[in-house]
Design a protein with these regions (language model features):
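The feature represents the first ordered module of a protein
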Residues: 1-29
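Short, compact, well-ordered microdomains
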Residues: 45-87
């Protein structure tokens, strides 16, 4: 059970964003986010969007830095991934 964080590479609102996910349960993800002070409004169906300025802080709090590819692979393997086409 691990909370994963990809590199900030997703541009929006004048900054770059990372995705914070769990490879086990959404509860693990929500618990980690709450302890780290990530607002619940940052949750987007299967991940939290976090701005680049929080990256180092979240890694220090225990999030495992991974590539985007590894994040998606592990999220899908966990059964927690919600594909873009299924978000409607």
């Amino acid at each position: 059970m691990t909370v994963l964080l990809d590199r900030p590479m997703w541009p929006a609102h004048g900054t770059l964003w990372s995705h914070l996910v769990s490879d086990a349960t959404l509860q693990e993800l929500h618990d980690f986010a709450a302890r780290a002070g990530v607002p619940r409004r940052s949750f987007d169906i299967d991940h939290y969007d976090v701005p680049q300025e929080r990256y180092d802080e979240l890694v220090a709090a225990g999030a495992l830095p991974v590539t985007n590819r590894e994040l998606v692979t592990r999220l899908a393997a966990s059964g927690l991934r919600v594909r873009q086409r299924d978000r409607r």
